[in-house]
Structure formats: structure tokens, C-alpha cells
UniProtKB/Swiss-Prot annotation:
GO terms for biological process: spermidine biosynthetic process. It holds the Pfam family Spermine_synth. The keyword Nucleotide-binding does not apply. Pathway: Amine and polyamine biosynthesis; spermidine biosynthesis; spermidine from putrescine: step 1/1. GO terms for cellular component: cytoplasm. GO terms for molecular function: spermidine synthase activity; thermospermine synthase activity. The active site is at D142. Keywords: Cytoplasm, Polyamine biosynthesis, Spermidine biosynthesis, Transferase. This is Polyamine aminopropyltransferase. It comes from the Bacteria. S-methyl-5'-thioadenosine binds at D96, D124, G125. Catalyzes the irreversible transfer of a propylamine group from the amino donor S-adenosylmethioninamine (decarboxy-AdoMet) to putrescine (1,4-diaminobutane) to yield spermidine.
Amino acid sequence: MHPFRRRVRPAVEAMPEVEISEEGNIRSLHLGSETIQSSMDLDDPPDLVLSYSRAMMGFLLWNDDPKHILQIGLGGGSFARFIDEYLPDAVSVAVDINPQVIAVARAFFQLPEEGDFFEIVEADGADYVKIFRGSTDAILVDGFDGLQIVDALTTEDFFEDCKRALSPKGVFVTNWWSGDKRYQSFIERLLNVFEGRVIELPAATHGNVAVMAFRQSPSLTQWEALRKRADELEGRFGLEFGEFVNRLKQTNQQTAGHLLI
């Protein structure tokens, strides 16, 4: 399937095997299966290649100048490169439990220089988030163990910890698979913790959904205002925000003029 593929043995026996593939100018990271977890365009590393990663950045409609972003799940560093390029003033922390993923990302996926604005932490993200109290503007969760979404990242306790970690206008964003038989139960837990302030933004392909939960109700909910914001952001970030708004309207509860959050 892939003209180039290399296998990297896991540093921890219980963790999935890390593999790298290349097809044309696209380098991808896999965890124990053919499923692509992260991809990088070798000609344009900051570009978000996978549609689910693009959808997850839809939170920028409500906060286009986050000061602090917590990533749970480093993968191939797609968000880290994007943030470094388009949000250079944001402090970004990427947490991953798998040391081999971190090593491979550093070696093969052109991560930003680690320093004041970017840090990688080897830790369990479900534990690490507990150190934050109202201080992070966005939490991006993309946790996959090679077979399914990591259970520890779908519990009400985890969602409560994330809610406490968020700043007043903070947004929790997670990547889930709509075909997972547990999907609706995940949504119900999130709705319960965030008191209904949850929306779904389907990715363009493959059944992934960027699910967003808000610490407090955002002021920007009018469709007309959202479309205006989308037009402003498309040129700045190179993402299809207008299409995001269309998909939000197709998927979520609404009135004639407003998205209900």
C-alpha cells in the first residue's frame, strides 16, 4: 500500500507499535495498524493534511488568539507545527504517554523547537490535565491506542478535569469516530459535564467528528456573524472555516438565526 514503510519497535511492551509510511510527499504515523494517525506534507509541514485535524481547529471561530493550548496526544505533531506557524504567540504543551511516539515525532516530523512556547511532556494526559486550573484556552484531545479511543479520555471524571482546566472562554475539542458504538454515550457524558454546551463538527471524510465543549456559552452564535468570522479567518489560517460553519448548521441544534450552544 505504501511505497515506503518503516517499523519502530515500541519502548514499552504494552504500547502499540509505531510505524512510519511515506507516499509521495506525505509522511504518516501509524500506531499498530494501517490506520493513519498523523500526516505531514513534506513540502508544507505546517499544513493540516487530515480532515479531522482541520476540523478540530474549528474552535478558532470562537477564540482566534488563544494564549495557551494543551494537546493530549502528540502523534506526528500536526497541531504543534500548525500552532507554531499560525499562532506563534501561543504557549503550546503536547502530552503523550508513549515515549516512542515522542521520539519518532522528534526525529521524523519536523517539530517546532522546544522552549518557552512549545513543550513536550511524557505523561498520561488524563493525569496531567489535573494540574491546570482555569488557565488553558483550548484542550485538543486526540488519544488513540491503535485500536480505539483511549478509555481514560472519555470518562466524566476526565471531562470534569478538563472543564476545570479551561479558562472562562476555553474550549475542549476531541476527535471521535462516529461509527464507534460508544459514540453516543461519550456525547451524553460530555453534555452532562458541560451542561449542554457541546457541538459536533464532522470532518470532511472518514467519519471523524471534532466534538467541542465550551466552559461557558460563547457570545458568537448567530449564523450571519459566524459566516463573517469564517471569511475573516480563512485567509489567515488557510482552513475552510466557511465549510465548517455549513457543517455545523447541518449537524447541530439551532434556531432560524442561531447555533444553539
